[in-house]
Amino acid sequence: MKEGSFVELSEYKHLIEEMQSAVDDFRGSLDLDALNESIQENEARMAEPGFWDDQAAAQKVIDENNVLKGKYDTFKQLADEVGDLAVAYELLSEEPDAEMQAEFETDFQHAEHDLQQYRLNLLLDGPYDRNNAILEIHPGAGGTESQDWGAMLLRMYTRWAASHNFKVETVDYQAGDEAGIKSVTLLISGHNAYGYLRSEKGVHRLVRISPFDAAGRRHTSFASVDVMPELDDTVDVDIRPEDLKIDVYRASGAGGQHVNKTSSAVRITHVPTGIVVASQAQRSQLQNRQTALNMLRAKLYEREEEKKAKERAAIQGEQMDIGWGSQIRSYVFHPYTMVKDHRTNYESHHGQAVMDGDLDPFMDAYLQWKLAQRNPQ
């Protein structure tokens, strides 16, 4: 083998070390011993004589064990794959061989792909990450400026969803006074929609030269984004009819156009918490009522989960004011262009691409950040 080829091969050493480091991180976050212990406990239960007496409970144990075994086996396979690569590299370093290197490079590409896929599966392992997402945008104080910023975010998320072939349904839409929106609620349907979009929850800050300011001054606007998983009926949320205040009104679409001429839109207020949800996307009042109730269930569930998380001191700063110092991400278009996430420090100088829906790098960085929090070094 020529010296130039060996230099090329030597570059793999650092890449393989990075792979091994990633595998070690995964091992730490998985806790293989506890995982294996849970598998053995389940298998012991499955071997008991009366295991099938309660078929529903038995199936639940089997399903849970399949998930655990899948996690364990997939990790072991990945660790072996990366280990084999390291051995192959050492052999090639000692005895260069063109045919063996070609095979090594193919194996490396496969391992790289498997590692990325495993990382994604590990990051999106929350109980509702695979669910559809309910996404709300609420502009902050600032009138037309903030309402226009809300509309820009609406376009950004719609473009992002389209790039993933996700379905977007506008559940509720309140148009701005002169431009933009006062609020909007979207149902974004697709595999892992909530898992990705939960990274977007928080306050988003815009700095730009205002198109609404004749003097061409720089303005700062804020909008909050809330994201919840769409829940099915198996998730138990206690909603008492006497706690609900239900109003009906005439639905109106973007631009103020009436969707229909009957009072089919429904707004529900949960009196004990003050949570308000609304739906005007469906054709009938009954359908809108059900959609609104589903959103209320999601919000109440989210509220309870946040309460538990705060009690465990696992979440900080979830309740934020729409204002200075509380934003998760800044979008600066003057005097320079940069979009920066303040949690992960990931940034992009391609502001227009981000506004066109190029959010995956930000979402990936957030998921990696969350994993690092679970597995501190």
Swiss-Prot record:
It is found in: Cytoplasm. GO terms for molecular function: translation release factor activity, codon specific. Methylated by PrmC. Methylation increases the termination efficiency of RF2. It holds the Pfam family RF-1. GO terms for cellular component: cytoplasm. Keywords: Cytoplasm, Methylation, Protein biosynthesis. The modification N5-methylglutamine is found at residue 257. GO terms for biological process: viral translational frameshifting. Belongs to the prokaryotic/mitochondrial release factor family. The gene for this protein contains a UGA in-frame termination codon after Leu-30; a naturally occurring frameshift enables complete translation of RF-2. This provides a mechanism for the protein to regulate its own production. PANTHER family: CLASS I PEPTIDE CHAIN RELEASE FACTOR, PEPTIDE CHAIN RELEASE FACTOR 2. Peptide chain release factor 2 directs the termination of translation in response to the peptide chain termination codons UGA and UAA. This is Peptide chain release factor 2. It comes from Lactiplantibacillus plantarum (strain ATCC BAA-793 / NCIMB 8826 / WCFS1) (Lactobacillus plantarum).
